[in-house]
Amino acid sequence: MFWHQPRQQQLRQLQRAASGAGKHQRRSPPQTLGDDGDAAAQVPPSPTGALLAFLNQHASEEGGAAAASADGRVSVSPGFCSSILPEHSQDLFAFSDPTSASPQPVPMDASLSLFTPPVPDCGRDVGEEAEGAVAPSWRAPLPAPQWRPVHGPSWWLSSSSPSGSSRGSVTSPQYSGEETSDAASGAPTPPPQSSGSSYVYGQALADLMAMIQEIPAPPRSVPDCRRGEPVSEDGMADRCETDASCYTTDEPMEAEPSEPAGGVSWLGERADRMRADQSPRGLGAEPHVAEAGRPSSCVGEERADVVAIAAVEERKEAARRSPDAERNDDEEEYESLPCAQEFFTSQELAEINARAIAESDEAEDEDAGSPAARSQSSPFPSLGPAVFVLAPTSAKSSRGMRKKAIAVSRVVPDNDGEPDPCADGPGRDHVSSAQSAGANGALETETSVPRSATAPAGAVAACAQNTKRGYWRGAAAGHAEEETDSDDEDVLVVDVSACAEPFESFAQRQQPRQQQHAPRNKPARQRLRAGAIVAAASGNTLTVPSEPPHPSLAPLWKMLNLWLSEEWPAQGGGQDEGEAAVSASLLAPGSLPELPDMCPRVAVGIISHALAVDLSAPGGRITVDEALLPKPPAADYVYYGKTGYRPSMAAHPDVRRAAEEFSASDAAARVYVEEFGMAVEQHERLVAEFMLQPLSRVSHSYGGSRLNKTEKNLCKICLPPDGGDDRDGGGKSRGGRGGGSKDASRTAMATGVPHIVHAMRDGRAALALPHLMDVIRVCRRYDASQKTYLLSCLRLAFAPLVFPGASPPVGADDSPWPTSPIRECAAALREGFRALNDIRAEQDPPADERSRELALPLDRAITAARRVAATAAGLLNAVGASVVHDGRVGLPAFFLRGVTERREDLFSAARRCPRALYSWERSMRATTAALWGHLASRGPIAAPVADLEELSQALSAVLSVTSVPDGGDVRYAFAEADEGWRALAVMLGGGAVRTSSGESGDAETDAAYALLAPGKQSSAGVNHPRGRPGRATASSPRTPASRPPHGSAAAPPSGRDSPPGALNVPEAAEEELRLAAARDTTGDLLSDEAGTDDDGDAPVVISYVGPSSPPGVEDPSPDGLAALRPLPEGYVPRPGDVLRGDPGADENDDDARAPCRVGDASPPRQLPSSSSFASSSLASAVPGDPYLPRSVAEPTLCRLAEHLQSDDGWTRAFANDPVGLAEFARRSTPGRRLGGQRRLDQLLSWTRRHSPRRRYSLIVLVSEKRPGDFRERAYAAAALAGRACVPGSACDPETWRDAEDHPSPSADAQSPLRSRPSRDCFPPRIAQPEASDDDDVGEGGTALLSAGDIGFAGAVESMLRRALSRQGQACAVVDARDDKDVLSAAAPRFPRGKPGLIYLRVAPPSEACVANLPSLGPSASPHRGVGGKHRDKRPCLAEGTPSAPSCRDAARATAPLSGDPVAHRLLMHRPAKPLVGEEACAALLGGKAGRRGQDVPLPFLTAATLRKVARVARELDPGWGHGDLGCESAVVFPPAAPPGPELADRHADRRRSTKGPQRPGGKRPRSSSSSSSASHDRSPSSSSRRRDGRPSSRRRPSRRMSARPPSRPPAAVILRASWRYAEEVAREMLDAAASRFDEADGEDPLPPAACGGKPIAPETLVALCEQRGRGPTSLPRAPTPRSGEALAAPRRSGAKDPRQGQYCPSARRSEAPHSPSPRDVALRLLERQQELNRQLLLELRRGSCEISPSPRRRDAEGRRFGCRQDDDDGYDYEGGRESPERVLGRRQSRRDSVPVRRRSGAANCGGRWMISAGRSSSSSSSSSSSSSSSPSSRPSRSATPSLSPSPSPPRRAPVDRSRSGRRRERDRPSANPFRWAPRQRSRADHSPDGTAPGDAPLNLEDGPGRGRPIWTPSSATTLPSRSGPEDSVDETETEDSAPPARLAPSPLETSRAEDSEDSEYPEYSNPRLGKSPPALKSREARRPSSKQPRRPSSGKNGHTDVSAASAFFLGRPAPGSCGRRPLGARVRGGTER
């Protein structure tokens, strides 16, 4: 609709229509406009007719009754006005108070004048842009908006019609159309229809207009302008014509106070002044106005006509109507018109006006008694004429002559509707006027004005404006050749118009006063400043202020005055300066002290027009000219590029589908096309996302965001590469998107930002934010950090526009309750501090300006300090009393009640007030008093202490919530209030000092402190001890019933730490004694001096409980007040506080009296519990916890069940948790339930996320930093799923918080999102991270609980009871709570020794989540050089992708030492500090910067940790006790380690990978770290997008880099104590494990005495658990073999061929009578190991050997080396050396001339030792590798079993991957990551069989336990041989030799073997994963087929690998079977060394 278009666009359309209509001849017949016009209808061929057509169209659109007649009148109903005023009451001019809540409505009974405002074009001429456009030059804007018609005279509204109906009529004084109906008949004529938009602006001037006083009737004749003869009105019409462009001028005017009717009478005064001042020429500073008649006392009694007098050349009426004259009018009108100066002077004008006024008086008397006049004047009276002389003008003619003229216009009414003999037509008077404007001429028009339509009853206003040649050029259309003659000349004209009343009711109210009208005296004249708008709307007089109305408008106001001063010269010019002197007098910025200032709204409107920006519009709107906008596209085209178009693709099915998805979602589209049709909505969504999301998500790269397939397809459809259609200059030539064949989705353009034309049409400045953000993004001048700064500034600048409700904090004076006692005390305190300042001002300033203490005389200082302190104490008491008083009814304090009653979301913030107000720490009381005085006075005061400013800022921030309006945004206020509360808690908690220097004050200051610590009896008769915590004063003995009604928010819990202000410091004790003495001397001060006020008001009762209660309210007792006082959140009693429920009291008395109210502190004893499990110290109470008596527990449980709306599962948990039940009762009391409902739902949200009927095998406990914060829970959920907690993902804390705001159904409800039971820990209403098929975390149920949840202890107890109730079930508790959390230290207490309970202590989850943000800037490239675009392929968080690498993968990808600078940020940490190098590694480990070399206190909560803990919990035998596991040890897989000193400031290159022909460049997918399962990396490479086009949360396999420096290679180890060394299996543990297998031994398998008090690692427990399954019942005794015979291989009935590696679960084991006992094997193993260790230590001491990394590795700075994270190789973390076990293993491997491939497991008992049964598979050391693969070299079945040192497996071939995905082997030895440098040994030192000379083979026949099968320790180590060269067995083999001895498989191995048919290692298959490890599977796939099945051995030589437990737990292939080469192996010539 036309009315909803921008203002300038409406003006442009109106001006074009008027200019186009003005080209037609005046008497041409009506024409029909084409498509380019406004309508295809009959339009009058004149500018006036064009405007009339617009008006008629608007009247018909608005539904008002409209009728047009040929005489230029349009009659409309009053509904026309009612439809205009409400819609446009604030568009241009609204005189209402901007500070009020709602703008004042425009009065409907005011006169309405329809004016068109000017086009505010700053500093340029708009007339040249459009054809016929009329626009002023605004190079000199005025301090007021100007309202003038663009063409034609002014419009006004009349409500009288000839037929007597009271319909409004819009009348034009100028209309040249033919007569189509009789004007007197009143028959309405249908208005001309127009298809275009209508235009009218009337209400703005209507507000300025008031009803004018009565003006006498016009004369019947006027004198001739040239001859001085009176001529008739129709004769005047022959030679006078009214100019179509009557403009207002800045003419001084007079105004008087409005009458009761609301009008002004200034025309009469104008006439008096003009009559008195008879200037000869009228060219001075004061123009002349003739007498306009005497003013009347009433408005609207008589009819008045506006008389226009013009001096022009007389023309013949017949000649004017001839066709020839019409043709020559345009050619001759400017040359034939002489200047107006030649016709009359100012004296003549004065005489003419005087004569007209005299005749008007005579006509008034005649018409008064005429009945016809009275009948026609009803309902509107007739008004007298208004004669107004225009300002002097000058123009420059074509002859170069400077002319001065005065333009006057006149409108003559008809003679009561009778036909005039001199007129052309019956019943009409033709009024013509012409204006001489020098050589420029004027546009001649004429009009017919019926008398009935020219009865004005409104107000008159004059607006000044300096009109430049642009207006005249538009007015004189077709005469552009003469425009250069008036470049520097100004034409000042004025237009006087009047308005009529639109409603009949107002006129009827004025009728009884018509006959009682009597003239009255004129008021005093009031001279107005030129350019000021005089308006009397509803009795308010408004003028332009001389000063800016608001400080924020001062810069704009100065600029406006500067424009005026530059454009207009100073005042004082003479008469010869022409209009310059007049302009100076009109527009000089002089002072007007006698006038009132304009309201700020008007000033804002003035500056808005001057700057072409609407400053008053809500949200800030900017008006854009319609001519600057591109044309709307055609039907089948849309906007494209800058100004181009392209064909619309709305019919495409993909586009339609994308449009439906966009309209259905609430997020912004990453690809927006014009076919969506929601450009404004997309703009708004982009603005919201930019203002709320972290800046790290904003792309800093030049290219656009990465799109998925669906979005790229949409770009391909709608954004063709050829640039689109070249229609109307669009496409590539006009800046079209894309060009050539370049993909539009990867260009620098923003695919999600719509075309800017939509934002320009909307006008809101906030919609430009996405475009500005994109401009910063694509700018290549700034880097990422600079762009972040610019975006931050952009966000700060646009914050008031996006969040208009955010307002600055206010003080106590803005309290909505002026009668609050807080306000009264604050006022008294302000007076006291003002007195202090006055005393200080009298004294000389101290010499030391740094001194903040008062330098006053002693007596005056004491008096002032006492008064201030007493007032401050009263203020604080009033605050406390307000809280107590409101606490009884459940409302906050008085000064917060008004806010919290309107906003429920503010209640939570208001409830935190008692937290600081209850804190009464003596060290800061005087500062608090000064703070309140500062807030009350809002001015700088003399601070008596040093930290006044800090406290002032804190409490100002706290009170910011009181200033939030009803509809405002409270997020900023909440954030500011939280900061204030934290600061107050620190300062008021005793952390701040009293003075800046720390010195004690004098006696006067001590007295002031004593006043604020009342220790004596107060006026209320209540004694409250307020001494130091932990110490009671002598004057206030403590009693069991006196409970301190306050709690320190910053005080630590009792029994753990001492408070910071305890009396353990001697200085504190001395200060207490000094204050006690001062308290005795000033004890009566409160009652004596502070009892009455200075003004004699009522005394202020000073007491701790506050002032007396209001009248009629019973004052409760002190005990009642103390009991009703609510406890602050997080209340913890301090040491020495006496709590209710004294332990010494009788329990019966306790229960009978029920001393503990709801929410009171509990007695320090064991809480009653009906559960035996709870009585085992799982849940215990500490002093200060909320306590609920038994009598109140049952009703509270019923109310809890109603609140939860679920079954009684969690109700039983609350029954066993009295603390949680009491907390619920305290928060759900009837008076508080309404306000705290939202917070209570958040604290009970865990009941909706967890089902009470589920068994949870993994419980994760976290701590919330602040109430309602789900950050730690979200990070724990991210760790569970192995995802990163990026903003916008399912693990985003904001998503959790939003989900909690909307209550969701219980966890039992079937939800499509709850597809897997492992997702039970997520809120049901949010998108959850997708878990891979291999992710088995939470299969048995995972729970996420916070220590701040209500019922936390009961929930943990219930979950543990249900999880451990099943036989054979274990439950793991991962405690990730913060040590600083008070609630975490209190409960729950887990039972010791509970079967099946695994308790692990880890660091908070948020400390382990990091991300790698690579730099994408130009870097040095070997191929492209420096500056070439080198894209970093390292993994990073893709923009807009919720899925991100997991914590451990992101940590591995972290490369702080890489060549390019990489920024490491802690996600969701504000502010995000970039961490590089050592700080990044320290952040990865959970430490802080600068903590290098320190131990990490706790391990991380990673996905790998949880996965292994969950697996241990499922597979561990619950019969074993693991309670001590949580004391010192935990499972940790550190993602990185801090770099060594040699690499602190250097860089490291990326680790190389194996190169192959199919993988050029060595790029092949790497497996994940050891912290993940072995099958985790075998998941197929999923796409980054799903089918629906949305980002997928699956991790994409990419190249990972390790952040391990060479000196500290971390491994997957079991950390204990100092968290630096691996777990070692002690001898006692093996003895205890072996003793368990004795049938007579029934004790605990691992008693604490056997472990020596040390904890046991879970990996060791798993291994021992496997061995325990092979007990005496499952392992029968085997026959003892003879010497030289091997053990028979165990056979199973029903099993498959054992050589195929397949076993049947029901297979039987064959007896092996001769097998050593596990105890014997372990003892011999340990003895041999100790002997080897001793030898190694001796060599190390002699210095004959050293342990150092390889020199090649040491030189390669960028390579990670050492063992992988899953290589638990016993590396010594304490000293940075290898363990002796590793040295021994390397020595043995070097003797065998075969490098060690793999290190040992967790036990670290040696190198690669294998159990060999029978003779070696090789005949000699030289032929070991060749004989291992031949069939003849297989061991004989009859070989005698023996334990001999076995060489390591042969060298593996390099791994290469073909296209089929299988690996091929090549002969390649494995590399040793560490170089062993022993002393040189000769070849003779080695025996021929490869064993050392000193090594003796192990005699299996010796020692007890013969006949038992060989027991293999679970430490993944094999037993070394003790046999020497002389005892070695013959290495030759026979075909009938016995196979090697195979160990009896454990039940765990048996279960794994069922699902691993394709693997040769059944014991290493993981049944939970459902797949075999990738390395094993690939080996099985590439092994050549053989007719004879292979034996189930892990080695090539028939040896058995027994590291199944360790390999399975670590989630990796067994040692020796890894599909990858060891970390650190180097490749040279395709062979690994």
Swiss-Prot record:
Comp. bias intervals (Basic and acidic residues): 223-240, 313-326, 1294-1303, 1575-1591, 1752-1765, 1774-1795, 1853-1869
GO cellular-component term (any): host cell nucleus
Keyword Iron-sulfur: no
Segments of skewed composition (Polar residues): 1912-1921
Cystine pairs: none
Location(s), subcellular: Host nucleus
Keywords: Activator, DNA-binding, Early protein, Host nucleus, Phosphoprotein, Transcription, Transcription regulation
Top-level taxon of the source organism: Viruses
Post-translational modification: A long stretch of serine residues may be a major site of phosphorylation.
GO molecular function, one term: DNA binding
Family as reported in the entry's similarity comment: Belongs to the herpesviridae ICP4 family.
Protein name per its UniProtKB record: Major viral transcription factor ICP4 homolog
Organism: Psittacid herpesvirus 1 (isolate Amazon parrot/-/97-0001/1997)
Gene that encodes the chain: ICP4B
